């Protein structure tokens, strides 16, 4: 039974959950399976501690997703990090999770630098994932915060995902260094019209870790 598509069944399950627990379940969850990352971005809360980078076991990630679907009746999961495409546990990656739970949809916040043509094709075959690639503005702003050459790797990720037919989004953190750029039409023309982004998430800078540098 696929209650992801059956609105009436989904509503009935929500009401049943409320009767049992006194409140509705969360509509979706945000899961950070690893704090490991291949970048060292200024102000990043996820890697603010350079020495402690925990990773959940595959069994734990599988259990969380299973319970979200079967107990909370959720069909939407947000994957954060760290860098999700660095995750590996028990010989498996998040692609194994995406393919196993093919009746769910996953939004993955990623720096994009690890999205090879092979990964993009696998995302396309699964058909239930959209990557939201983190940017800071244009090449200058992105490389200043994320490291030299990062923007070019992002452009390659966009090309790989476009070629594979995977829906792409962007995520951006507003700071004192890019606020003017985010207010201009050129930014949106570039990412949406030229590169093919279909949506955007904008976040406020969290004042923790190395964020005082941004």
Which residues are covered by each model-predicted region?
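Short connector loops/turns at beta-strand edges and beta->alpha or beta->beta junctions
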Residues: 20, 36, 136-138, 205-207
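A short, flexible beta-alpha/helix-coil linker loop
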Residues: 47-51, 138-141, 207-210
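Radical SAM/AdoMet-radical enzyme domain recognition
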Residues: 61-79, 87-204
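A C-terminal junction/extension of Radical SAM enzymes
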Residues: 199, 205-214
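N-terminal [4Fe-4S]-dependent radical SAM core
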Residues: 1-30
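Canonical Radical SAM [4Fe-4S] cluster-binding loop centered on the CxxxCxxC motif
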Residues: 23-24, 28-59, 72
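Flexible, glycine- and charge-enriched loops at secondary-structure boundaries
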Residues: 50-58, 144-151, 214
């Amino acid at each position: 039974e696929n209650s992801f598509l059956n609105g009436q069944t989904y509503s009935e399950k929500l009401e049943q959950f409320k009767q049992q627990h006194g409140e509705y379940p969360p509509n979706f969850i945000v899961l950070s399976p690893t704090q490991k990352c291949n970048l060292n971005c200024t102000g990043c809360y996820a890697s603010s501690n350079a020495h402690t980078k925990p990773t959940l076991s595959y069994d734990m990630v599988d259990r969380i997703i299973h319970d979200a679907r079967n107990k909370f009746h959720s069909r939407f999961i947000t994957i954060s990090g760290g860098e999700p495409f660095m995750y590996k546990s028990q010989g498996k990656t998040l692609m194994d999770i995406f393919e196993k739970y093919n009746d769910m949809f996953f939004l993955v916040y990623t720096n994009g630098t690890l999205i090879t043509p092979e990964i993009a094709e696998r995302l396309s075959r699964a058909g239930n994932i959209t990557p939201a690639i983190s940017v800071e503005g244009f090449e200058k702003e992105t490389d200043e915060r994320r490291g030299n050459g990062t923007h070019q790797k992002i452009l390659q990720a966009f090309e790989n995902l476009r070629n594979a037919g995977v829906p792409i989004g962007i995520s951006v953190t507003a700071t004192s260094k890019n606020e003017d750029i985010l207010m201009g039409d050129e930014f949106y023309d570039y990412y949406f019209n030229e590169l093919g982004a279909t949506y955007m998430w904008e976040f406020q800078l969290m004042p923790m870790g190395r964020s005082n540098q941004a």
